[in-house]
C-alpha cells in the first residue's frame, strides 16, 4: 500500500525542493494596497461571548432570511446537479453576521436560489470540499471573533452530512488559516498556504483523511502564499499565483506569477513555467487535463489590486497559456465550482464596482459559452461553493463509511501500482518466479526417478497404459478424485494428472516449428499436417495443452455422456430476460475458457450481461456451441461471432480453430448460423467498417498463422477475400479509426531458425477502399494479445504480453495502458492497471474503458478481476468480478433501446457508482 511520507513538523523554516533556497516567513502583514477587500472593511467591532451565543441561538431557529427567499431542507437533486454555497461577507454591511452564516442552494433546472439554513459559525474566506455525500469546511475568518478590529483566522473543520443535514465538528487543522486553497485527490483533502491568526502569510501544507479524521503535515510550499488558485491534474497538485512576502524584512507583500507543482506520493515540490503576469485571488479548475484559471487580481499602475476579466487555459504538458474567455465585469475572490457539464462563477470582489458582487455566471462546457443566471440573494465575497452531483445515493453513515474504506483501499492499491510502474522490473520479477518454478518442477521429476532424457526415449507400453499425444510421456495411475465437502456443486472433481502442466519437449519447443506456417485460403493441400504451437508464444502459457487423450480416456472409463447442464454459478446471479436495456448501454461477454477447468464446456457457451450503473453481472443464457479465443462485433441490432476454438475438437492435445459464423439478432432473440468464413481462425480480430465486418489474421485449423483478411457483407450473407497482411500474425489488436483498419502488434512466425521472440511492435493500416497496406508509428514496446478500442477519437491499447529476456522467451503480462497521440504521432503510456493481463477483452462505454478477464502470467492462471479506466479523469478502479476465471472471451456493447442520458452524464454516473 502506497503511503505518503510524513515529514517532521515544521515551525519557522520552510523546506522545499533542491531547486529553491529556504525562506523564512516575515512577521509583517501586507499593506492595505494588497487587501482583497480593497480596504472597504477597515475595522470590525468586537462581539462578546454572550452576544455571540445569542446570535447563534437565534440562527438555529431561523426559518426565513428575507422576504421573497424561500427556505428548503432537501437538496432535490434527483434529476439535475445542485450548487451549495457557504458563508461569505458583504463589504457594504460587514456586521450583518447572518450573511456569513447562511447557506444558499441553487437548482439548475429552476434557476433560483433558496435559503438552505445556517452553519454552526459564520465564516468568510474559508474553503469547502464535497466528498462522499459530505461537505467539509476548513478554516476562514470568523467575523464574531475580532482582535484590534481584525477578523481572526480559525483552524476549525466542520462536516455537513447532506443526507440528514447534520453538522459535526471534526479535528482542527494544525494551523489556523484563511485565504487558503483546497483540493481533493486520492480520497484525501489537501490544504495549501493561507494567512494565519497572527496575520502572517504561511507556506504550510496539510493533508486531511476523512476516514480517520486525522491531519498530517506535508512538505511546505517553497514560499509563503495566500490567495493562490489550487487544483489537481493527473496525480499532481498545482498551486498557481497568489500573494507572497519578500525575503527582505519590512517589505510589502507582492503578487506571485509562479506555478508550483506538488507530488503527494513523493512529498516533493517542483516549479513549472510562470504565469504571463502576476495574479492572486483567482480560482482554478481542471477540464480535459488542462488547468483553467478564472479571474483574479493583478497590480494596477498605482500599485493596488485591480480585478481582471480574463479566463486563461494552461496546458501542463506544453507549458502554454492562452486566453479563452472574458468576463463581463472584472472580479477576484470569486467562488468557482463544477456541477455536471457546467462551471459556476459565483460572487467575488470587483475593483471596478468597488464592492462585493451578487453576479453569478455559468460556463457551459459543451457549448463553450458564458451565461448569466439568477443573482445571489445578497452580494458576497469570500464565499465557498461546492457542486452536488446527481442521484447521490441516500446511504447511511455506516454505509458511507464502509464505502469510503473500500474506496480508500482501491485508491491505495492504485497508488501502489503507479509507484511500481516500471514494466521491466515487473518482467524481471515474473521471470524469476517462473524460472524458480521450473527448477522446482525439474527437481521433482528427478526425485521421482524419471530422468528428463527418458521423455525422449522409446519405451515399452503395456496394453492398459497410455501415451500422451505430443510429448510421449509415459503416464499411469489416472483415477477420479473424490469430491470434497466444500465442493458439492460438481458431480465429478478434476482428475489428478501427475507432472502437469508438463515441460515442453525440447525437440518441438523452438521457434523453427512455426517457420512459414501460413498459406492462402484457396491453397489446395494434398495432406493436412497440424503444427503445434510452442509454449513460448502460447497465450495460455501451456495450461491447455495435452488434455485430449486424458479427457477422452477418463470419459470412456467413467462412461460419461455429453450432458448440457446449468452451470453451478447460476444460483449467484440475478435473472435477466432482455439482452438490451431500455435506457443504459450494457456489456455482453461471450464464451471463454478456464485453463484450470478446460473440460467444462459450459463456460464456452455462457453469455453474461454487465450493467454499468448496477455494477452487476447477470447470466443471460447460452450460445449455440462453446467457443474460446473467438471474436465478436455488434452491428445493426445483431451480435456476430466468428471462428474461435471448439473444446470438443482437438488435435495433438490442442483445441482446433473453426470457420463458423453465428449471429444473435436482438429482434428474434435467437442464435443463427450464417455463411462460414473461407479460412478457419482463432486468436484473430474482428472490426466493423462501412457496412462490412472484417476478420484479420489468426491461427487456422492446421495450427499455422494466417495473413488472410476477409470481409463479410451481412446484407448478402457472403464472405469476400481482401488483400492479405504483409506478415502472418495472431494475437494482434485491431480497431477502425480515421478510415483505416489499424493492426497493432501480435505474434508472427519466424524464419531461418531465428530464436528471437516473434512478438511485434509494428503498426500497419489497411485501406478497405483502395485495398492497400501502409505502415504506422510503431508501438512503444512489442506486445501481443493486447486489446484496443477507440474512445474520445483516440486509440487506446490496453494490457498485452511482452517477450521476456531469458533464454526461453516466455510471454509476460504487462499492465500498461497506451494511447496514440494524434498530434505528436507517438504512443504514450497513460496509466497502469492494478493487475497485469493479456488475452483480455476491452470495451468502451462513453469515456470509460472496461477490461474484463484474461490471463496473468505472474499468477500462471486466468483471472476474474475486472477493471474500469476513465479517460477523462485518468483513474483505474476495480469493478465487480466475473463469476469464474475466464480467458479467450469476446465482448460487445449493446446500446439502449431509447437514449436517455447524455454521454458525459452517463460517464459521471458510472464513476460515481464505482467510487461509492
Curated annotation (Swiss-Prot):
Q: Does the keyword Repeat apply?
A: yes
Pfam assignment, any one:
Kelch_KLHDC2_KLHL20_DRC7
User: Manganese as a keyword?
Assistant: no
Q: Which UniProt keywords apply?
A: Kelch repeat, Repeat
Per the record, the domain of life is: Eukaryota
Pinpoint the residue ranges of every Kelch repeat in the record. Answer: 82-133, 134-187, 188-235, 237-289, 291-341, 342-390, 586-637, 638-691, 692-739, 741-793, 795-847, 849-896
Q: Which Gene3D superfamilies match?
A: Kelch-type beta propeller
Region (Disordered) residue ranges read: 393-426
Q: Which SMART domains match?
A: Kelch
Q: In which tissues is it expressed?
A: Sperm.
Output the InterPro entries linked to this UniProt entry: Kelch-typ_b-propeller, Kelch_1
Listed name of the protein: Beta-scruin
**Species this protein is from:** Limulus polyphemus
